[in-house]
């Protein structure tokens, strides 16, 4: 499931932004694995921010435009049960129609790829490995190592 043939290179200055977007999608993935894909429906769009619904569910990591402009329509398609190939096509069109470059473009690509992975039920660890690979060797290795500690901690807490 590779949406994009080429990826922009991530710069060191993109670290926090890319990590925040990756954290956002890992939180969505974790939520959908426990509650099902329709759990995404409780998230509403308000002031360019995806936020929790009135049920008081935990907040997601913060994302802002242009990510919300691309991610929200894709999330709606997934919730509405649109075929994954159609979601992929629309993701490609949304990204092709923008003028973002560098780290911002990479964050959009990372998010679109992640949402398609969430739609098919990919595990959090595989999703993390996918996003880390997209970030490049330096940032990707750092993110993967950070998340491996989180995953290991979760597993220890479940035992």
Identify the role of each PLM range.
Residues 1-159:
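Large intracellular
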């Amino acid at each position: 499931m590779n949406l994009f043939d080429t990826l922009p290179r991530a710069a060191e200055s993109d670290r926090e932004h890319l990590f925040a977007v990756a954290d956002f999608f890992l939180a969505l993935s974790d939520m959908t694995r426990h509650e099902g894909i329709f759990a995404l429906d409780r998230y509403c769009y308000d002031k360019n921010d995806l936020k929790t619904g009135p049920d008081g569910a935990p907040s997601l990591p913060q994302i802002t435009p242009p990510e919300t402009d691309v991610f929200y329509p894709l999330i709606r398609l997934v919730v509405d049960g649109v075929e994954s190939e159609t979601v992929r096509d629309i993701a490609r069109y949304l990204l092709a129609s923008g003028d973002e470059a560098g780290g911002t473009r990479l964050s959009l690509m990372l998010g679109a790829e992640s949402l398609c992975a969430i739609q098919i039920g990919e595990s959090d660890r595989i999703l993390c490995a996918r996003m880390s690979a997209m970030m490049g060797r330096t940032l990707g290795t750092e993110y993967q190592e950070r998340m491996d500690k989180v995953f290991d901690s979760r597993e220890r807490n479940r035992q």
